[in-house]
């Protein structure tokens, strides 16, 4: 058995039940949860990101939530600079760490040692890209850096702008600047992929709207402007349309469900291609996960 410390990553598409299982695992193992959900890194974005509630955060310590305001974008490099010391601290103290999230690129960067381009935020460029609109920006990226564009959804405003930002600021495509330096950890990937995911997505979407997604979106728009890139993401974009009167609540819910299903499909594809998780069977998730963890701990 290797003496290297163990990093457990709990991954799966949105609405697959990661939060509930993470809380149980964290309590059983006496660990905090290290967040690897890109939208939960931002303050004030609580309902729309299904961020762990205050009660859940009181139950189990969570790291890497609420790092910045929504108008202060976090690059992958900056996220790694926050996350890596957090992981190393847990490994030093406990010999084990628990990462939880559905942001595949962020997980991959941490577990494989991907080193993204060292290009800082470029606010003026981002303003220009926002003014151009995603319908122009993604094709522009596809023409200039097709490798990067192929890995980014045409609807993903934040990552599209980041790839263009790197390209324009450095003069080199983002796809050609990344390198890999594997970390000195063992990785155990546990995957959730429930057969009833469509139903779970529908139920969670209804719950987000009941919990105040529309009101949260209005507060964010009032404070940061409706053109905030994060307000174009799933759920927030539809809530904006409710607030400006261009869509009904039921139509917004239906669109959010559809966009979430499409996103979950892309997540599943990413996890199959980029990760090698031990898929949990849905029967007794906690027992099965603990058995796998104990086997790796020896």
From Swiss-Prot:
For the region Interaction with substrate tRNA, what residue ranges are annotated? 37-40
Name the residues that bind substrate: 14-19
- Which proteins does it associate with, and in what oligomeric form? Monomer.
Record field: catalytic activity: adenosine(37) in tRNA + dimethylallyl diphosphate = N(6)-dimethylallyladenosine(37) in tRNA + diphosphate
Catalytic activity, EC: 2.5.1.75
Query: Which cofactors does it use?
Result: Mg(2+)
- Tell me what this protein is called: tRNA dimethylallyltransferase
Any one Gene Ontology molecular-function term assigned to this protein's record: ATP binding
What gene is behind this protein?
miaA
> At which positions is ATP bound?
12-19
List the source organism.
Synechococcus sp. (strain CC9902)
Coiled-coil stretches: none
Q: Which GO terms describe its biological process?
A: tRNA modification
Q: Which UniProt keywords apply?
A: ATP-binding, Magnesium, Nucleotide-binding, Transferase, tRNA processing
Q: Per its database record, what is this protein's job?
A: Catalyzes the transfer of a dimethylallyl group onto the adenine at position 37 in tRNAs that read codons beginning with uridine, leading to the formation of N6-(dimethylallyl)adenosine (i(6)A).
Marked site (Interaction with substrate tRNA) residue numbers: 103
In terms of HAMAP family, this protein maps to: IPP_trans
Family, per the entry? Answer: Belongs to the IPP transferase family.
